[in-house]
Amino acid sequence: MAAEDVVATGADPSELESGGLLHEIFTSPLNLLLLGLCIFLLYKIVRGDQPAASGDSDDDEPPPLPRLKRRDFTPAELRRFDGVQDPRILMAINGKVFDVTKGRKFYGPEGPYGVFAGRDASRGLATFCLDKEALKDEYDDLSDLTAAQQETLSDWESQFTFKYHHVGKLLKEGEEPTVYSDEEEPKDESARKND
């Protein structure tokens, strides 16, 4: 068949072989699409590692906030840290309060988990419910959760302990806050630093 093409076009066989690949690529719409996709992906891989130029983006992240000193919070005190009233975002999980400000895209006012900002998210995370109805305004003892829900909550707590700064605990009504010294570090964070 190649010999027939040579005879039909009157071209030298070496010219067809060298131009054949390019001819195939540029005459087939599918090949053009695949070539474009490869070029786009290569561009994203090479360009993706470079940070966006500052000042060009509307989504500029605010400068990082200083680390919050350890302290305990009542549910009412925690509500202030929702990313709107205060730029810092705190969430309570299983009685522990975490600073999730660096996860603003997830836990900020416009994020998918924004409903939990400044709140005790334990019940919502344990039951996979992202509605405000899953949240209580007062301390939630979580005693009515099933064993599976408690295990799910424990998994969430482990993830948050690993990823975010643990800043204190959520206080029950009438419970006195713990007085933390400036040098004191929680055990889980010192263990993380030794790894």
From Swiss-Prot:
Phosphothreonine modification, residue list: 74
Any one biological process term the GO annotation gives: positive regulation of protein localization to plasma membrane
Residues the entry annotates as binding heme: 113
Main location: membrane
Residue segments, region Disordered: 173-195
Ranges in the topological domain labelled Lumenal: 1-24
InterPro entries tied to this protein: Cyt_B5-like_heme/steroid-bd (IPR001199), Cyt_B5-like_heme/steroid_sf (IPR036400), MAPR/NEUFC/NENF-like (IPR050577)
UniProt domain Cytochrome b5 heme-binding: residue ranges: 72-171
Residues with the Phosphoserine modification: 54, 57, 181
Membrane-spanning intervals of the chain: 25-43
Pfam families named among the record's database cross-references: Cyt-b5
Superkingdom as given in the UniProt entry: Eukaryota
Subcellular location as annotated: Microsome membrane; Smooth endoplasmic reticulum membrane; Mitochondrion outer membrane; Secreted
Molecular functions (GO terms): heme binding; metal ion binding; protein homodimerization activity; steroid binding
Subunit structure: Homodimer. Forms stable homodimer through hydrophobic heme-heme stacking interactions. Interacts with FECH; the interaction results in decreased FECH activity. Interacts with EGFR, CYP1A1 and CYP3A4; the interactions require PGRMC1 homodimerization. Interacts with TMEM97 and LDLR; the interaction increases LDL internalization.
Function: Component of a progesterone-binding protein complex. Binds progesterone. Has many reported cellular functions (heme homeostasis, interaction with CYPs). Required for the maintenance of uterine histoarchitecture and normal female reproductive lifespan. Intracellular heme chaperone. Regulates heme synthesis via interactions with FECH and acts as a heme donor for at least some hemoproteins. Forms a ternary complex with TMEM97 receptor and low density lipid receptor/LDLR, which increases LDLR-mediated LDL lipoprotein internalization.
Other comments on record: Non-classical progesterone receptors involved in extranuclear signaling are classified in 2 groups: the class II progestin and adipoQ receptor (PAQR) family (also called mPRs) (PAQR5, PAQR6, PAQR7, PAQR8 and PAQR9) and the b5-like heme/steroid-binding protein family (also called MAPRs) (PGRMC1, PGRMC2, NENF and CYB5D2).
Protein name as catalogued: Membrane-associated progesterone receptor component 1
Taxonomic source organism: Pongo abelii (Sumatran orangutan)
